[in-house]
Each structure stands twice: as C-alpha cells, then as structure tokens.
Regions:
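N-terminal acidic leader/helix
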Residues: 1-27
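Generic structural signal for short, flexible, solvent-exposed coil/loop and linker residues
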Residues: 6, 17, 35-37, 54-56
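Intrinsically disordered, low-complexity regions enriched in small/polar residues
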Residues: 7, 18-19, 29, 39, ...
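Short glycine-enriched loop/turn motifs at secondary-structure junctions
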Residues: 9-12, 37-42
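Short aromatic-glycine-(Arg/Gly/Cys) micro-motifs in beta-strand/loop hairpins
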Residues: 24-36
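Short, compact, well-ordered microdomains
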Residues: 40-69
Length: 69
C-alpha cells in the first residue's frame, strides 16, 4: 500500500512535503497549505518551516491519510 505523502527533514529547520496520491493533492490544495505554510519549493517538494510541519502532519493524520518513505 502506498502512502499519501512523503515528508522528510533537511535538518536545517525545514521539512519537505510531497503529495503522492491524487487525494493528497486535492487535500493539500483544499487546505490552502501552499499559501499558509510553504516558504519555498523544488520541482517535487513543498518546503515548510519545521515549526509548521506538526500542524500539517496532524491535519494529514486527522484526514485518515498516511505517509510513505
């Protein structure tokens, strides 16, 4: 079973999030996370300050989604 998001830490005060399922993409957009929390992005990942990653992770879990590595 594949997860909905990839989340990793760069150990520089940021976390990288990547929606990998269609429902994760919709969830990310519906919750307006890009405008609320994203400080930068790469081709594949949204970069978020680590202090905000807990809010995002909790919202993902509350929506019955999960993470993959």
């Amino acid at each position: 079973m594949i997860g909905d998001f990839i989340c990793s830490s760069a150990n520089d005060g940021t976390h990288y999030f990547r929606p990998v399922s269609a429902r994760a993409e919709v969830f990310w957009k519906e919750n307006n996370f890009t405008q609320k929390y994203v400080i930068d992005n790469t081709e594949d990942y949204y970069i978020v300050k680590s202090v905000n990653s807990e809010v995002i992770c909790n919202a993902i879990r509350e929506a019955d989604m999960d993470f993959t590595s």
